[in-house]
Regions:
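FKBP-type peptidyl-prolyl cis-trans isomerase
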Residues: 27-61, 97-103, 153-161, 177-181, ...
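A C-terminal, polar beta->alpha supersecondary segment
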Residues: 28, 33, 44, 76, ...
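C-terminal motif of bacterial Sec signal peptides marking the signal peptidase cleavage site
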Residues: 18-21
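Soluble non-cytosolic domains of exported or imported proteins
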Residues: 80-84, 88-97, 111-112, 144-155, ...
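Positively charged n-region of N-terminal signal peptides that target proteins for export
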Residues: 1-8
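Acidic/polar surface patches and capping/hinge elements
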Residues: 139-140, 162-196
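Sec-exported extracytoplasmic/periplasmic mature domains
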Residues: 48-56, 90-109, 119-134, 153-166, ...
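N-terminal targeting/tethering segments
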Residues: 23-145
Length: 344
């Protein structure tokens, strides 16, 4: 009888210990990555944006109403929209928890549970409020949302982890640097250029109008009477401005210039870029009059830069490899995650 009682007690102890492993932090058992829990709440935080993405994917299919009752659980070809949300979220959840685990293992943070994160979040907003009251410079909103603080903290952790790996983990031989130099040279020479452009600026009246402007300008090019001809043939009123771009001399952040550079990067001299946002309510098409790529320096002059890029690359590969080794387990709650769990 004593043996039977002892056995039953042992079995109950194991059951309670398993339940405690999932409930230790006060959150529902959901997923585990490398023996560390991802709570339903943390997973839902990451899944939120994938609700909108999944709705767009299904909404683009003919005859599907994403607002219809039961939409999220209805299976089509064996897959429901919630299955798609889980598919999109799983990789991100494992990556983010992996960053936390590696940061903890390397002494950057002490706690990685969601409960500890919420305490840090509350403390951050408390400090921001205090800074405001003391008249100190405050960057960003007075009060961060949970999602904003999560993204900020994870970004900071990942950056710190990359820097740690670059300095403490990654080793580079001279032969590796020499082999990587041509890769960097090709990428840099394609990235940096000087260009002379003509910007055709017009009121943004939708995608059809932008496409019409792009096609007309590509066919006729830049002439002195472009505004008149474009208005007569398409009904689009426009003005023309000249612009010079040198990517090696880009200074302060300029969203317009950034958009221009990104568009011009994809085309060559004599070609026309897709329409870009110029200012609020206005679009522009850039005609590339000339474009010259900047020469990249020799191995000796650019060695430090090449090493910096290679260290960064190897650090990211190291982190990705370490995360890929972590065992991932999914609990029953993962299978029963609902739309309401995510948006509440």
């Amino acid at each position: 009888m004593k043996k039977k009682t002892a056995l039953l007690f042992f079995i109950w102890f194991l059951i309670l210990e398993c339940l405690a492993g999932c409930a230790r932090q006060g959150y529902s058992c959901f997923m585990e990555v490398g023996d560390h829990e991802i709570s339903k709440e943390e997973y839902a935080l990451l899944a939120y944006d994938n609700i909108a993405r999944t709705a767009r994917e299904y909404g683009a299919k003919e005859g599907i109403d994403v607002n219809a009752p039961g939409f999220w659980e209805q299976k089509r070809d064996g897959v429901s929209p919630m299955d798609r949300v889980r598919e999109l979220t799983d990789g991100e959840a494992v990556h983010q928890k992996g960053i936390q685990i590696l940061a903890k293992e390397n002494g950057m943070i002490d706690e990685i549970g969601y409960e500890a994160f919420l305490k840090q979040y509350q403390e951050e907003n408390k400090q921001r409020k205090q800074m405001k009251e003391e008249g100190k410079v405050l960057y960003g909103p007075l009060e961060l949302s949970v999602s904003q603080y999560y993204s900020y903290r994870q970004s900071q952790l990942e950056q710190a982890l990359e820097e740690f790996a670059e300095q403490k983990i990654v080793t580079i031989r001279e032969e590796e640097l020499k082999a990587y130099y041509p890769v960097v040279k090709q990428a840099e020479e394609k990235k940096n250029f000087q260009a002379k452009l003509s910007l055709v600026i017009f009121e943004d009246a939708g995608e059809e109008q932008k496409a019409a402007a792009e096609q007309w300008i590509a066919a006729h090019g830049i002439t002195d009477d472009l505004p008149l001809l474009l208005a007569e043939e398409t009904g689009i009123s426009a003005s023309v401005e000249s612009m010079a771009v040198d990517t090696l001399e880009l200074g302060k952040e300029n969203l317009l210039l950034d958009r221009v550079v990104q568009a011009v990067q994809e085309v060559e001299a004599g070609e026309v870029t897709p329409a870009i946002e110029y200012t609020d309510g206005m679009s522009a098409v850039a005609v590339v009059e000339s474009k010259e790529y900047a020469a990249f320096g020799s191995y000796d002059t650019e060695r430090d830069y090449v090493e910096y890029l290679l260290r960064e690359k190897k650090a990211r590969e190291y982190i990705a490899d370490e995360i890929s080794r972590l065992e991932v387990k999914k609990g029953k709650a993962w299978e029963t995650l609902t739309y309401e769990d995510i948006i509440k």
